[in-house]
């Protein structure tokens, strides 16, 4: 991401969560705060943009639904935009709540974007410290949006501005009160935008300052990322959209490569969800177009 730009992917992800909360049923993940961070003008502008791009996504759907923009938007949201942000957030927060029961005291959200966890769970203010780590421009955008939405930043939420994929340092976290205690990390929608070497370095650095039992949930793209088409060519479209937005996808892994990367930093895979697993867990028995995204896997790994 360029220095003075906030992340387009954060806006699109928040839009997808807001759209799902408003218009889909049953809900995979209810981010009822996201709509407050995407103002009405942004919601309309992003909606219009997606509707206008329907020919890029699917020419047949563009023709069939040419007189029904709302159905076009629903198709784009459910096929292209929403599946991964919804399911990975649902999975991550389920794991987090289990980790809290097991004694985690800190939650570090890497690439937090417009995450709303703290605002949806005020009951955790006295038991969990939350550190949002992201590019300074993205954090400033979020702070502005929180102010516009009249949302007060809770006392347990700490903003840590850092371009962490390039140079990770614990110093800014320590300055915000981070302690050497059991910690849960999330790294969602990030791994495929950085190189293999940057992923390995980041994981190694993250777990150098936390005790055994600390863990991480992240998603990664498998080795078919740059060759798979997916439903309605959506995998190919995802790769092209990322490149066009200035945040190209850079890495993909086999399961064995991810396992080796984690083992090198002293982590064991506790749970791995393949696209089929994700589909069974989060998208079964639906009557709409939502389904797990091909090529994207979820991992929960724990420090030995």
From Swiss-Prot:
EC numbers, comma separated: 2.1.1.-
Family: Belongs to the UPF0677 family.
Class of the enzyme per the UniProt entry, highest EC level: transferase
A Gene Ontology molecular function term of the record: methyltransferase activity
SUPFAM superfamilies, A to Z: S-adenosyl-L-methionine-dependent methyltransferases
Name of the protein this chain belongs to: Putative S-adenosyl-L-methionine-dependent methyltransferase YktD
Keywords tagged on the record: Methyltransferase, Transferase
Chain sites annotated for binding S-adenosyl-L-methionine: 134, 163-164
UniProt record, GO biological process: methylation
Domain of life: Bacteria
Disulfide partners: none
Gene name of the encoded protein: yktD
Free-text function comment from the UniProt entry: May be involved in polyketide synthesis.
